Amino acid sequence: MLFNEIMSNVLALGLHPYVGFMHRIAKGHPALVSDLIEEWRAPLIDSMVLAMVKRNMLTKDMFETNETGCFLNPEARKIYLQTYNKKLRSDNQYFEDKYTYRESIRQQCRKYASVILHSDITLYEPLELR
């Protein structure tokens, strides 16, 4: 879901999602999206999932396994989606201002686009959420 959030911002900004810098360019893999997702994985997804487990929102019986892997059951998927959307709407301190996580992602993608447009790496500031 975070992947799709970033992909939509990359496309809206007219960036080429398959040309990245950290992830290997491979046919069918949007390397730029993978690059941009790295900053958000821990502060957004990892922290959310850990909080869900700590609050017993996700329990062992909500997981189903089969020969292809381990998956959330329908009840758990609904809880996860609701929590994810709530997290994206929640505020965070993004540099000097308060934004929702969704707006912060958009801002960070814009900063990356500015670097490309102006060929100036100093326009990109690494993510610092407080």
Predicted features, each with a name:
Residues M1-R130:
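N-terminal intrinsically disordered, cationic/polar leader segments
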